[in-house]
């Protein structure tokens, strides 16, 4: 059976047993901030197992895409060198949430593996392990399924603590846990290795293919196990492993899925497909990279993006080792899509995006890869011992972009190790330097501790009545605020919007009789809304009734910009592709700022397309509609959620233009798109690797921006004695005239230089039979000095020349050496000394070099270096 057939058979088998087929979740965990990547089938069901989420089904089956690279579960260094380590793998799993338990789970597993209709594995080839004290599972296997006792193994606590066992699963030190039973396949006596639990269990003869976890206990802090009211089942079977068994091969890289990727990798690199470790690395890494990019991860220098960058660069290095010339990795994406795109449609829809991202990252790394490898080779040649020092590893990381594990990979090939502790010390020193260069203000939200839920009334109102429930000054709870004091007011209800989702908090004032508190900002901590400001008059006490007044004009302008960000987000996905995801935003009354995932600058024609699409939606004047619903219904309607935001059971869905823009959002918005009036993009640029930023203005601010641009056009037209209508023609004429004058100036400068050359040649001094000339000619640019040096070399014959000038407040230097002297004296060497003397850099060929600097006062001293340079070199 092919891998795709095995996957489909597994899903279909459990559907026939009443399970709901659930699509693989993203590789970016949406409900577990402790996880870097999804690494098991149960990740997306974690809240179901914890009883925190109820779904419409109690039985589920899935084929989950998983990544193990970075963090606690990191297989990266072993990938390519072993038969079964991968950065990406598929986990087939069936799950019961308080439905069936051990008997059914064991029976299902055995029937799927051994039934002629399904996998038809020989029963005598299967071994089973259970937790030592799990008599229930042991009896089911031996008495009901019929596995003989000689192929059953009880595994006890083999990891140094109670319930610390290969056959006892825990979610953490406390919480759901339980025994598990594992099924192993025996490859036969011709393969070395012993059964599970034996001293030889790490051999390749007995391979674990399926693990069934029985969550039946809750472990409390005192270590006591308490039975769960509704036990559950979590199982996992690696697709690659079971495929190897069914296809009668001993390495996962020999299965059909990898054979096509290995062939495509060899073709892209231009090498033979001979199962080298480096080729396996490339074939493995294209899977993790392709799926990570499809799920929205982009290469960067932190978090998930850095793990992706490490994997890409490791693949590039191994391709380079196999002889790849230029970019090759992105060429393998098509083979990945052909192999896995049917099961995972996101690969098909994102193919072009994946290829562009990989190619851009390859090209960026290529600029430093060769140079970094040379530096490493030099360091290894000088190495005494078998450990690469931490400072060398750090230098390669910091200067040439070599991730630590890439250097470790290269060291491993030489039977060397790296000093990881030394590398971490260098990294920490860099972090300390970064922290010392930064300053941070106090987070007053973190200082305010209040157990209050403020009711928000501001979706349809900007004023109302409320009661003061808490007051804070300098982060401390107080009973009263006096005139002139800054503080924080917490109310039982408020129309003030608290900063969230990129929208700034409302401002305004609170009135309590003759007392007035000016609200400058509103934030939120827990369920409490914090009104930050100053008491302008009177005094304010806890329990006082107040009238709330939001600055309506500011709120309205902010709401227009917020709605415009939603339209812009939708337009970006239409123009650039579905890979675009919001990475941050800032919306206030003056403008909007929107950060999003994209790997290259946006072209001018794309900027125009974005504006056209958004303004077309504005002109439609469609209603901005909101709906309260549950999260699953919202997702079914196509609502986009901001990754990293925690949503409750009920969410607010905001729609504009029908299905043009549908997002989860709790912010304040326009009533109709036409209220926005107009959107104008005023800037676009990069803010981090793989993240771009657009700034835009709307409504009155957009009109003011266009009016200012119109005034600039009029002023420019006036300067060239033209009008707006003929400004381009007038500017073209001025520029053409300017070019003609510059050409005339160059000709005059050349004549002046020729005349100066006749005069300067007489100033040369003789040093050991060589004419040496070092002269200062202020006002001359580098081009004029180059021409003059050429002329002087012809006039002087055997000569060394250094000319310097202060031009436009910068030092310009040109050095020349006649070719008969370049074996002993090099212009580039002279230039390095002279440029360093004026606080700059320089270099060039042996016969001609250029440089410059910023210290005009040191120019004469730099020129004086010429004679000693010649004397020492001859």
Swiss-Prot record:
- One GO-annotated biological process of the protein: alanyl-tRNA aminoacylation
Top EC class, one word: ligase
User: What's the cofactor?
Assistant: Zn(2+)
Matching Pfam families, A to Z? DHHA1, tRNA-synt_2c, tRNA_SAD
Enzyme Commission numbers on file: 6.1.1.7
| Alphabetical list of InterPro entries matching this protein | aa-tRNA-synth_II/BPL/LPL, Ala-tRNA-lgiase_IIc, Ala-tRNA-ligase_IIc_anticod-bd, Ala-tRNA-synth_IIc_core, Ala-tRNA-synth_IIc_N, Ala-tRNA_ligase, Ala_tRNA_ligase_euk/bac, DHHA1_dom
Q: What SMART domains does UniProt report for this protein, alphabetically?
A: tRNA_SAD
User: Which GO MF term does the entry hold, naming one?
Assistant: ATP binding
Instruction: Name where it's found.
Output: Cytoplasm
Ligand binding (Zn(2+)): 562, 566, 665, 669
Q: Where do the coiled-coil regions begin and end?
A: none
Q: Which domain of life is it from?
A: Bacteria
Mainly localized where? cytoplasm
Q: Which reaction does it catalyse?
A: tRNA(Ala) + L-alanine + ATP = L-alanyl-tRNA(Ala) + AMP + diphosphate
- Note accompanying the cofactor annotation: Binds 1 zinc ion per subunit.
GO cellular component labels: cytosol
Keywords for this protein: Aminoacyl-tRNA synthetase, ATP-binding, Cytoplasm, Ligase, Metal-binding, Nucleotide-binding, Protein biosynthesis, RNA-binding, tRNA-binding, Zinc
* Domain remark text: Consists of three domains; the N-terminal catalytic domain, the editing domain and the C-terminal C-Ala domain. The editing domain removes incorrectly charged amino acids, while the C-Ala domain, along with tRNA(Ala), serves as a bridge to cooperatively bring together the editing and aminoacylation centers thus stimulating deacylation of misacylated tRNAs.
Q: What does this protein do?
A: Catalyzes the attachment of alanine to tRNA(Ala) in a two-step reaction: alanine is first activated by ATP to form Ala-AMP and then transferred to the acceptor end of tRNA(Ala). Also edits incorrectly charged Ser-tRNA(Ala) and Gly-tRNA(Ala) via its editing domain.
Family under the similarity heading: Belongs to the class-II aminoacyl-tRNA synthetase family.
Q: Report the protein name in the record.
A: Alanine--tRNA ligase
Q: Which organism is it from?
A: Pseudomonas fluorescens (strain Pf0-1)
């Amino acid at each position: 059976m092919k891998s795709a057939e095995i996957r489909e058979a597994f899903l279909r088998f459990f559907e026939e047993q009443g399970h709901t087929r659930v699509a693989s979740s993203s590789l970016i965990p949406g409900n577990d901030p402790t996880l870097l990547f999804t690494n098991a089938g149960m990740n997306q069901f974690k809240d179901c197992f914890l009883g925190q989420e109820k779904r419409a089904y109690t039985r589920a089956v899935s084929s989950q895409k998983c990544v193990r690279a970075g963090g606690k579960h990191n297989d990266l260094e072993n990938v390519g060198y072993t038969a079964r380590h991968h950065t990406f793998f598929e986990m087939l799993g069936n799950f019961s949430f308080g439905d069936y338990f051990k008997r059914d789970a064991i029976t299902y597993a055995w029937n799927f593996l051994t039934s002629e209709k399904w996998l038809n594995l020989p029963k005598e080839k299967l071994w089973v392990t259970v937790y030592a004290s799990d008599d229930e599972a042991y009896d089911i296997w031996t008495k009901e399924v019929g596995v003989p006792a000689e192929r059953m193994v009880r595994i006890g606590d083999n990891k140094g603590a109670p319930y610390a066992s290969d056959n006892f699963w825990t979610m953490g030190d406390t919480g759901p846990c339980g025994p598990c039973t594992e099924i192993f396949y025996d490859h036969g006596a011709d393969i070395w290795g012993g059964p599970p639990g034996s001293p030889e269990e790490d051999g390749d003869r007995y391979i674990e293919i399926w693990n069934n976890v029985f969550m039946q206990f809750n472990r409390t802090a005192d270590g006591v196990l308490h039975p769960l009211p509704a036990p559950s089942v979590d199982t996992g079977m690696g697709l690659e492993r079971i495929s190897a068994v069914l296809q009668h091969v001993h390495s996962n890289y020999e299965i059909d899925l990898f054979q096509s990727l290995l062939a495509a990798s060899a073709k892209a690199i231009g090498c033979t497909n001979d199962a080298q470790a480096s080729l396996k690395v490339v074939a493995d890494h294209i899977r993790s990279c392709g799926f990570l990019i499809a799920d929205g991860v982009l290469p960067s220098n932190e978090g998930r993006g850095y793990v992706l960058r490490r994997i890409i660069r490791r693949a590039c290095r191994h391709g380079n080792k196999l002889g790849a010339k230029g970019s090759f990795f992105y060429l393998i994406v098509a083979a990945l899509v052909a192999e896995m795109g049917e099961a995972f449609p996101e690969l098909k829809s994102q193919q072009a995006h994946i290829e562009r991202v990989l190619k851009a990252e390859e090209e960026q790394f290529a600029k430093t890869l060769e140079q970094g490898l040379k530096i490493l080779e030099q360091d290894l040649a000088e190495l005494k011992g078998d450990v690469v020092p931490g400072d060398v590893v750090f230098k390669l990381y910091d200067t040439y972009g070599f991730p630590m594990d890439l250097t470790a990979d290269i060291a491993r090939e030489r039977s060397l190790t790296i000093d990881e502790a030394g590398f971490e010390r260098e990294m920490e020193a860099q972090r300390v330097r970064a922290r010392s260069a930064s300053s941070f203000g106090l987070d007053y939200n973190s200082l305010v501790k209040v157990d209050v839920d403020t009711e928000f009334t501001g979706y349809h109102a900007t004023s109302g009545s409320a009661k003061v429930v808490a007051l804070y000054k300098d982060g401390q709870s107080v009973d009263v605020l006096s005139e002139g004091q800054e503080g924080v007011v917490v109310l039982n209800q408020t129309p003030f919007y608290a900063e969230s989702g990129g929208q700034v908090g409302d401002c305004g004032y609170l009135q309590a009789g003759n007392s007035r508190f000016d609200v400058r900002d509103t934030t939120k901590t827990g369920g409490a809304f914090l009104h930050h400001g100053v008491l302008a008059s009177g005094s304010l006490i806890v329990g006082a009734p107040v009238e709330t007044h939001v600055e309506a004009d500011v709120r309205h302008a902010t709401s227009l910009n917020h709605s415009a960000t939603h339209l812009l987000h939708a337009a970006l996905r239409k123009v650039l592709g579905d890979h675009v995801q919001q990475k941050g935003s800032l919306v206030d009354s003056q403008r909007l700022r929107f950060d999003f995932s994209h790997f290259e600058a946006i072209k001018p024609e794309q900027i125009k397309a974005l504006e056209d699409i958004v303004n077309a939606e504005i002109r439609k004047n469609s209603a901005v509609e909101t709906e309260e619903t549950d999260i699953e219904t919202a997702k079914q309607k196509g609502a986009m959620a901001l990754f990293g935001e925690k949503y409750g059971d009920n969410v607010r869905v905001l729609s504009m233009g029908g299905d043009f823009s549908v997002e989860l959002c709790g912010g304040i918005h326009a009533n109709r798109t036409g209220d926005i009036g107009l959107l104008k993009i005023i800037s676009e640029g990069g803010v981090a690797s793989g993240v771009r930023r657009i700034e835009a203005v709307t409504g009155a601010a957009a009109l003011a921006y266009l009016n200012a641009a119109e005034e600039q056009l009029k002023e420019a037209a006036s300067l060239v004695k033209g009008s707006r209508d003929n400004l381009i023609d007038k500017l073209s004429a001025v520029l053409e005239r300017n070019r003609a004058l510059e050409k005339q100036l160059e000709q005059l400068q050349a004549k002046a230089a020729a005349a100066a050359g006749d005069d300067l040649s007489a100033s040369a001094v003789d040093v050991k039979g060589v004419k040496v000339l070092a002269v200062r000619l202020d006002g001359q640019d580098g081009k004029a000095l180059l021409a003059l040096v050429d002329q002087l070399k012809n006039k002087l014959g055997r000569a060394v020349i250094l000319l310097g000038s202060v031009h436009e407040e910068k030092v310009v230097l040109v050095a020349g050496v006649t070719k008969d002297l370049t074996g002993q004296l090099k212009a580039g060497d002279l230039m390095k000394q002279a440029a360093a003397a004026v606080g700059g850099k320089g270099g060039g060929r042996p016969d001609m070099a250029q440089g410059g600097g910023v210290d005009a006062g040191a120019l004469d001293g730099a020129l004086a270096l010429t004679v000693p340079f010649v004397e020492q070199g001859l």
